[in-house]
């Protein structure tokens, strides 16, 4: 049986120089329309803080089990923290050609610290995306829940300040009976409370670590 031809061209090697994901099998970059269609950095850059936190934890773990040396792990963590400082200060240049927040941060990390190329050991990109999304959602739920509690407190204060005010209660677009304005406001407090309970339930579902699941688990 004839052996399959061996590709000797640099562009055919699986090892790629480009930091763009999935670029190893292609000799040139995507067309402009394809690049615009597949990029997500325009909206997923909001995950940068959680992506860095996950990478810092992963680097620390790799250093702990000996995949990275202690010195490498420390240098990677320092580089990730410095990248976070630059983003916070508005000094980070997001590159749309790198497609998403993960590749942007990974490219900058390996530029600053060559040992950063080892960081993805034992971690699927799918793990990383799921982790970032869950951490971001967790923070958003906490913030929204706090805002709802503030709204409830404001409604209670307003109800207490108007405990003797009477307003018409409507049914079928007609005035049906007199009701206390305070009772009307407190009804909304209870409605918001049910929304808070739903958020807290969502938090318990989101607050699960997906690391180690890989692409297909």
Please describe what each predicted stretch is.
Residues 2-6:
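Cationic, amphipathic, low-complexity segments that mediate targeting or membrane/lipid association
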């Amino acid at each position: 049986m004839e052996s399959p031809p061996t590709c000797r061209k640099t562009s055919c090697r699986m090892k790629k120089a480009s930091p763009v994901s999935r670029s190893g099998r292609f000799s040139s970059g995507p067309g402009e329309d394809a690049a615009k269609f597949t990029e997500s950095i325009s909206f997923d850059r909001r995950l940068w803080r959680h992506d860095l936190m996950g990478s810092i934890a992963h680097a620390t773990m790799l250093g702990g089990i000996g995949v990275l040396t202690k010195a490498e792990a420390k240098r990677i963590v320092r580089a990730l923290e410095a990248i976070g400082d630059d983003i916070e200060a508005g000094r980070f240049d997001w590159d749309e050609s790198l497609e998403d927040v993960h590749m942007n941060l990974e490219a900058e990390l390996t530029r600053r610290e060559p040992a950063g190329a080892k960081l993805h050991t034992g971690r699927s990109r799918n793990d990383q995306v799921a982790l970032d999304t869950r951490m971001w959602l967790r923070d958003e739920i906490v913030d929204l829940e706090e805002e709802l509690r503030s709204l409830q407190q404001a409604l209670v204060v307003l109800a207490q300040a108007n405990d003797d005010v009477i307003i018409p209660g409507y049914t079928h677009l007609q005035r049906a009976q007199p009701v206390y304005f305070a009772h009307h406001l407190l009804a909304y407090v209870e409605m918001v409370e049910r929304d808070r309970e739903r958020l807290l339930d969502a938090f318990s579902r989101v607050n699960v670590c997906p690391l180690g699941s890989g692409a297909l688990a």
